């Protein structure tokens, strides 16, 4: 079996690539930043693709990468190629709207949210949910373009002044703001086991709480990255 490895950030993938090489598994490396593909040709020289492209656009990154990756994954699946982290997974990972729907279907307790695609609809959605609310682009990472509004006056002013940015696909969520205990908690599960958990101090009006050392954020310090049980 020939395996291809689709990646974007070498530093995020080098340990996994090394693990394959150390186990004598050869990979065909594909850098999404350099990828073009012939849609008329189905002469694909690998049987399995591992997708490691980040689904979240953020500042200083070409947002078209998200959609170019999605087109490539769909095209490969139509061609019969097996993919780990395929088109459906990639899309779910990028869409806060779909993620919220999945949380609700699983009966997980999550803040009420209404999906919108017109800025003017944000006010009606917020009044239905109740203030305070936060507005998020459907697709986006690093806390980009997330804003909190405490009243209809604040939100109407932002709408009138065209200050709301719904991101690369022009859609988003109006979501009930839930007061916290001063920390953001991050928990990741691998299979049936806890992979890791962290908590980070909340900084007012900041929504970027990436826990990875490769993230370029100014709010990180040792106290923020405390592990918890």
Residue ranges and their predicted role:
Residues 8-112:
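Conserved N-proximal alpha/beta basic substrate-recognition cap immediately N-terminal to
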Residues 1-4:
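Extreme N-terminal starter segment of soluble prokaryotic enzymes
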Residues 106-130:
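Rossmann-like NAD(P)H-binding beta-loop-alpha module
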Residues 37-38, 121-125, 154:
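Short acidic active-site motifs
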Residues 8, 54, 118, 138, ...:
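Flexible loop residues that form catalytic
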Residues 83-84, 111, 134, 173-175, ...:
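Structural detector of well-ordered beta-strand residues that form the stable sheet scaffold
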Residues 100-104, 126-144, 166-182:
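ATP-grasp fold ATP-binding core
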Residues 147-229:
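Phosphate-binding site of ATP-dependent enzymes
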């Amino acid at each position: 079996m020939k395996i291809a490895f689709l990646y974007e950030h070498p530093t995020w993938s080098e340990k996994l690539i090394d693990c394959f090489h150390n186990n004598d598994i050869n990979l065909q490396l594909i850098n999404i930043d350099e990828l073009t593909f012939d849609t008329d040709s189905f002469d694909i020289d690998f049987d399995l693709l591992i997708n490691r492209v980040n689904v979240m656009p953020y500042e200083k990154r070409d947002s078209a990468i998200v959609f170019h990756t999605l087109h490539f994954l769909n095209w490969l699946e139509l061609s019969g190629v097996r993919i780990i982290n395929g088109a459906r997974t990639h899309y779910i990972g990028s869409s806060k709207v779909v993620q919220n729907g999945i949380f609700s279907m699983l009966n997980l307790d999550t803040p009420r949210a209404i999906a919108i695609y017109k800025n003017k609809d944000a006010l009606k959605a917020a009044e239905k949910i109740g203030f305070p609310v936060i507005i998020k682009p459907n697709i986006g990472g690093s806390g980009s373009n997330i804003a909190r509004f405490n009243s209809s006056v604040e939100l109407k002013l932002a709408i009138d002044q065209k200050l709301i940015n719904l991101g690369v696909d022009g859609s988003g969520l109006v979501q009930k703001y839930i007061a916290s205990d001063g920390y953001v908690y991050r928990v990741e599960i691998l299979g049936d086991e806890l992979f890791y958990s962290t908590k980070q101090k909340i900084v007012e009006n900041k929504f970027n709480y990436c826990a990875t050392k490769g993230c370029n954020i100014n709010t990180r310090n040792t106290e923020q990255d405390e592990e918890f049980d």
